[in-house]
Design a protein with these regions (language model features):
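Structured, hydrophobic secondary-structure cores that serve as assembly/anchoring elements
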Residues: 5, 12-18, 44-47, 233-239, ...
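A structural-propensity feature for long, helix-poor, extended segments
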Residues: 51, 164-186, 234-261
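Short, charge-patterned binding micro-sites
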Residues: 40-59, 237-240
Length: 335
């Protein structure tokens, strides 16, 4: 039986990344209500007490962007500067321009149109190159993988308890993570559940853990997938060791993937401090990595590009293979 683990995470409405997403999409929605053919490339960044809105927008609509920003921040739950930002009092900086004429020309008159196509769907060109991929699976009614759906449901449940007032100490920011164990590609059990939530400083961690275990996890995760080996981490930032290591060789390995995972755990220290030490990450190496990729850069002699453990791993794999062959031979003689 082949055992694998897969982890997915979800962030809550008040997570800075998600807050920025909601503001950008809220601006888009407001513009589309007035101008369905507007072109909106809106980016948002957030810091303590500050929201910046920038990008390129071409529209005939007139929307009050600062008002939209403040409304969304307050709706998410940031109504006090002690939370990190207050929608009523924060600064909102706007740096918007019209869409680039070159991009506008390509979008407004596609290559197919210029070549003579009169198909209505051919008239609008893409504004940039794009790569898209996706898939559907049978693990959930939503045709999505189980780990991400459970992570989303956990995040929604925490937000629900915050908004209803049942857990009044909760604040808008947070993150959830679920690790699912698979056996031969099928869901077997839950290996780990992580819930991290922003909260009032007067509440101790034990109270939060008890509430998450009592009110959130049982309401979301099927009991049959939980067992006494399932690990629960509540506000667990600071855990050093990875929950799991997964290897996929696409049936090219001479050794089982489980044994390869054991060798990786044995010979590669994946704790943050060890990664920093082994890859010498406290040196000023980063500017050279900003362009042309972090991998496949032999001219930079990057520590993570070295294959100095390849021979060691090959020797151990060979020894393990020999041991397995000897065991099979002995078993055959015994028969």
């Amino acid at each position: 039986m082949k055992r694998t683990f897969f982890t997915s995470e979800s962030v809550m409405e008040g997570h800075p990344d998600k807050l920025c997403d909601q503001i950008a999409d809220g601006i888009l929605d407001a513009i589309l209500k007035e101008d369905p053919f507007a072109r909106v490339a809106c980016d948002v960044s957030a810091s303590t007490g500050l929201i910046t809105v920038f990008g390129q927008i071409t529209t005939v609509s007139t929307v009050d962007i600062p008002a939209i920003v403040r409304s969304i921040i307050q709706a998410v739950g940031y109504t006090d500067s002690d939370f990190g930002i207050d929608g009523k009092a924060c600064s909102v900086l706007i740096g918007l321009d019209r869409q680039s004429p070159d991009i506008a020309a390509g979008v407004g008159s596609s290559l197919e149109k210029r070549l003579g196509s009169d198909d209505e769907a051919d008239q609008l060109g893409a504004g940039d190159q794009g790569l898209m991929f996706g898939y559907a699976c049978k693990e959930t009614p939503e045709l999505m993988p189980l780990p991400i759906m459970l992570a989303h449901r956990l995040a929604k449940k925490v937000a629900e308890l915050r908004k209803s007032g049942e857990l009044p100490y909760l604040r808008p920011d947070g993150k959830t993570q679920v690790t699912v164990e698979y056996a031969d590609g099928h869901v077997k059990r839950i290996e780990a559940v992580v819930i991290a939530c922003q909260h009032d400083e007067s509440v101790d961690q034990e109270r939060i853990r008890e509430d998450m275990l009592r009110m959130v996890i049982p309401a979301v995760i099927p009991a049959e997938l939980l067992d006494d080996q399932t690990k629960y981490f509540v506000n667990a930032i600071g855990v050093a060791r990875p929950v799991s290591v997964r290897v996929e060789t696409f049936e090219t390995a001479s050794l089982s993937e489980e044994l390869i995972e054991e060798l990786i755990n044995k010979h590669f220290d994946l704790r943050p401090a060890a990664i920093i030490r082994n890859f010498d990450l406290r040196k000023p190496i980063y500017r050279n990595l900003a362009c042309y990729g972090h991998f496949g850069r032999p001219e930079l002699d990057l520590p993570w590009e070295r294959t100095d453990k390849a021979d060691l791993l090959a020797d151990e794999m060979k020894a393990l293979n020999n041991d397995m062959e000897n065991q099979e031979g002995n078993a055959g003689q015994g028969q």
